[in-house]
C-alpha cells in the first residue's frame, strides 16, 4: 500500500478540507500516487438529488444493495452539525461497544491503530472508519500496526508500520473499499451525515453510469455475505447496543415531541 493511501479522510464544503484517497470504478492511475487526493468530481447540491435518484434506479433490481444505498441517501440533506463533540463521542462509544480500546491522542503521535487502541483525537467520521477497519481486517491482523496495511497519512512512525505490512496493494485497495462502505453505513446507523463521507470517498463518481452502481452493489453484497451488514443494509455487529441506542434516541424524540 503506497504511503499516504487511505480512505480515512476526505473533503466536502461542510467539512474542513483534509486529505482523501479515492475508490470507485473510475479512479485514475494517479490515485495510486502516495500524495493524498480529494473528491474527483464534486457534485453540486442542486444536482445531488438527481444523482441519488439515478443511482437508485441503477440498483432497482438488486434489493439488498438498494436498501444499503437508501440508508446512505436518507442522510441528505444534512439536518444538523458535522463533526460535533456528540458525533465524536458516538464514534468512541461504537469502538468500545466492539471491545476496541481508544486513546485520546492525535494519530500523528505514532499510529492511527497500534494493534491495541484507536487514537481518537480526529474527526468523528475517521473514528467510525477506523472501527470499520477493525471489523474488516482478518482477526490475525488486528494485532498489527495499521492492521498490516502499511502507514496511512496520519502515521508518523512509518518505518515500523511498513515493516508490519502484510497486504499487497490490490488487497489494500479492496479492503479500503470494504472499510469505506461499512464505515459509511455505520455513520448512517449513528445518525451522522453519512452522505458526506459517501461523496468524499468517491462512491458517486460518474454517477450517471451503471458501472458506478455495479461497483457499489458488489461491495454492499460482499459486506452482506460476510455478515457485516444485514439485508436492509444495516450494520450487523453489536446489534443489542445499536438497538438500545435507537430506542433511547426514539424516547428522547417522543419526550420532546
Regions found by a protein language model. Give the residues of each.
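Substrate-binding/catalytic groove segments of enzymes
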Residues: 186-198
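Post-HEXXH active-site segment of zinc metalloproteases
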Residues: 106-114, 137-176, 198-203
